[in-house]
């Protein structure tokens, strides 16, 4: 069906800029954009449907490119403990931290995980998100990583959102492999990744390169295996220390390296040369009260594309609003509203390997967009929370969330 969406202003985000079109219109044909431009330049179109957007500002659908949406349990009790003076080490020694999430996730059924993840996902969708990446990583064995990835696929098949599934088996060391990190990495490479990829459950492979997780050498083994399986890679890197993980990611042409508070200028140079996107996660920075900022000057100087995401997870960023992350990126990292919006559209699509079809409003791309009742695009980063008045269009069809 061909639809004319008229009477709007557009921030198309082409090339990662606002790329504003005033007094504009969009023609969609099925799920794709057929025409976009000033309404006055549109010849009398043939269309089956005409929708008046009442002067709204239209942006691409938002893309949350780094989340851990599927997990069992709840760690708000630990949050309260930390604020009462209990250290993270004490919480972990008592069986808390990521170990508690792994236990709860392993104990939960697929249906239970789906139900809790669906509730969290609906918050993102109400914020204007039309594409989301979700990681495994709280199962840490084949059976439970498969369970999480199956839930992720199910969410993509049942909810009005495009979902990309990332296998993060190399997230932490499971209890049954205590003090045997090399053995666990071998298990991931020899058993888990080949099986999960063969079942069609994996779109990309991620790992956590950090002193409290896995070394660059161990991560490299995972990357080599991913390459043999023709799967792109991503990396949690330089969140708490500088181990050269982001340069390692660049060497393997990773889609993205994420967190990056402790990355160096040499890392930025390597990422720019490889086209690897820097995914910044202001929610985790805020929640952990970090003080080391990502090197924004180096990222800008060398032209590294910058994306923003919620990092939705139970331990370090229980963030249910991608728009709130826009404000945090501007306030904490001193990004401009234009940079921040590019970070959840154009560059977020690049971070998922989807830039040919998503992330900007251009002819031939997927017709995912949001018509916002706002005065200017910067309002999306300006307002702190709240459900802004909007109309969400996915694949050329208005969606009711």
Curated annotation (Swiss-Prot):
GO terms for biological process: L-histidine catabolic process to glutamate and formamide; L-histidine catabolic process to glutamate and formate. Fe(3+) binds at residues 66, 68, 236, 311. Zn(2+) binds at residues 66, 68, 236, 311. Pathway: Amino-acid degradation; L-histidine degradation into L-glutamate; N-formimidoyl-L-glutamate from L-histidine: step 3/3. Disulfide bonds: none annotated. It is found in: Cytoplasm. 4-imidazolone-5-propanoate binds at residues 75, 138, 171, 239, 316. Keywords: Cytoplasm, Histidine metabolism, Hydrolase, Iron, Metal-binding, Zinc. N-formimidoyl-L-glutamate binds at residues 138, 313, 315. GO terms for cellular component: cytoplasm. Its EC number is 3.5.2.7. GO terms for molecular function: imidazolonepropionase activity; iron ion binding; zinc ion binding. SUPFAM superfamilies: Composite domain of metallo-dependent hydrolases, Metallo-dependent hydrolases. InterPro entries: Amidohydro-rel, HutI, Metal-dep_hydrolase_composite, Metal_Hydrolase. Its cofactor is Zn(2+); Fe(3+). Binds 1 zinc or iron ion per subunit. Its main location: cytoplasm. It catalyses: 4-imidazolone-5-propanoate + H2O = N-formimidoyl-L-glutamate. Belongs to the metallo-dependent hydrolases superfamily. HutI family. Catalyzes the hydrolytic cleavage of the carbon-nitrogen bond in imidazolone-5-propanoate to yield N-formimidoyl-L-glutamate. It is the third step in the universal histidine degradation pathway. NCBIfam families: hutI (TIGR01224). This is Imidazolonepropionase.
């Amino acid at each position: 069906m061909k639809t004319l969406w008229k009477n709007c202003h557009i921030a198309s985000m082409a090339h990662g800029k606002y790329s504003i079109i005033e007094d504009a219109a969009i023609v969609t044909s099925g799920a794709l954009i057929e025409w976009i431009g000033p309404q006055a330049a549109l010849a009398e179109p043939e269309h089956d449907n005409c929708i008046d957007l009442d002067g709204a500002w239209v942006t691409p659908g938002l893309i949350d490119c780094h989340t851990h949406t599927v997990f069992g349990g709840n760690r708000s009790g630990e949050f309260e403990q930390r604020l009462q003076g209990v250290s993270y080490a004490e919480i972990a020694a008592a069986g808390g931290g990521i170990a508690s999430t792994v236990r709860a996730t392993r104990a939960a059924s697929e249906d239970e995980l789906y139900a809790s993840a669906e509730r969290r996902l609906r918050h993102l969708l109400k914020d204007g998100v039309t594409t989301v990446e979700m990681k495994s990583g709280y199962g840490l064995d084949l059976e439970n990583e498969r369970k999480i990835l199956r839930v992720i696929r199910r969410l993509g098949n049942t909810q009005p959102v495009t979902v990309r599934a990332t296998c993060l088996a190399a997230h932490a060391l499971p209890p049954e492999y205590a003090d045997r990190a090399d053995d666990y990495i071998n298990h991931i490479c020899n058993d888990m990744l080949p099986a999960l990829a063969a079942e069609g459950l994996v779109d990309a492979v991620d790992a956590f390169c950090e002193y409290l997780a896995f070394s660059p050498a161990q991560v490299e083994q995972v990357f080599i295996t991913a390459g043999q399986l023709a799967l792109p890679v991503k990396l949690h890197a330089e969140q708490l220390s500088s181990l050269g993980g982001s340069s390692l990611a660049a060497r393997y042409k990773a889609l993205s390296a994420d967190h990056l508070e402790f990355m160096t200028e040499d890392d930025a140079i390597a990422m720019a040369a490889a086209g690897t996107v820097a995914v910044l996660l202001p929610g985790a920075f805020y929640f952990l009260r970090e003080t080391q900022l990502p090197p924004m000057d180096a990222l800008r100087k060398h032209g590294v594309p910058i994306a923003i995401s919620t990092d939705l997870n139970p331990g370090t960023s229980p963030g249910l609003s991608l728009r709130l992350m826009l404000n945090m990126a501007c306030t904490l990292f001193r990004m401009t509203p234009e940079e921040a919006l590019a970070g959840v559209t154009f560059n977020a699509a690049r971070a998922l390997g989807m830039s040919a079809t998503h992330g900007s409003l251009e002819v031939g791309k997927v017709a995912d967009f949001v018509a916002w009742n706002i005065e200017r695009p910067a309002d999306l980063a300006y307002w702190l929370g709240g459900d802004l008045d909007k109309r969400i269009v996915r694949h050329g069809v208005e969606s009711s969330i």
